[in-house]
Amino acid sequence: MTMKKKAIKKNPIKKTSPLKKEDSTLIKTITKKKTTVKKKYEKISTGIKNLDKITEKGFVKSSINMIVGGAGTGKSIFAIQFLIEGLRKGETCLYISFEEKKEEVYSNMLRLGWDMEKYENQGKFFFLEYTPEKVKTMLDEGGGEIETLVLTKNIARISVDSITACTSLFAKETEKRNAILSLLELLRKWTSTVLLTCEKNPSIEKKTSSILEFEVDSIITLYSLRIKDKREKFLEVFKMRGTKHSTEIYPFSIEKKGIDLKCKSCKRLPSIK
């Protein structure tokens, strides 16, 4: 017995969309734009030639970087040298000091051949002396006058000296942590490339270093060690996100033109942890 197959007509079901035609077109356009946007990965010079060589051409643009070291290791010189590199390239730069006076910084840097007053008169360099009280006001205002300056003058590089002095106003651990996080959030919003100096001190380290080490994009540590009858300075790239960097420890000296890193004489020092 054979069965007749009945022809079944397939009635196509019309699919309806809650989106209007113009909405659909708009979404396609936005999606297309998103797929074509590529995140730029740029590097900028640290201002120290040999440091650029061991960090794939320097700092990542718009990153936050921290220089850690004890007294006399060269943190402030590093911070200014980083800005000098930008100034020589025509960039506008900002130095925020929480400790030293403007006259002291200018006098010290002039000995290295860096005429900061000249750049200031050209409208390319700005120096701000900030007390801890002013920092609190700035954080409460969400940026305040510094944000206005950064945005209107198109500041490319910012050095903050030092982040430890910045938090000295806050007594409680939670207040310090919140202040640091708020400051870093502001700095990221401005998209400038930032260099922070941080005092290496056991009492300060316990309170702030763990937060800073996690939040910043790179950490460079400066050491001043007594070896035999004299003190020698060393530099270590402890961390640098998105960069294949050297893990060696290099000696450096402070010369007439700033920090000079000795890449050829790399050393491993068992006393450094």
Regions found by a protein language model. Give the residues of each.
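Intrinsically disordered, polybasic Lys/Arg-rich low-complexity tracts
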Residues: 3-37
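Conserved P-loop NTPase
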Residues: 35, 40-42, 151-157, 225-273
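Pre-Walker A adenine-sensing motif
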Residues: 48-58
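Short hydrophobic/aromatic beta-strand immediately N-terminal to the Walker A/P-loop
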Residues: 65-68
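Conserved P-loop
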Residues: 70-134
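Loop/turn-to-beta-strand initiation segments
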Residues: 92, 154-157, 190-197
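Phosphate-binding/switch loop-helix module in NTP-utilizing enzymes
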Residues: 130-189
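Conserved catalytic-core segment of NTP-binding enzymes
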Residues: 169, 173, 180, 184-190, ...
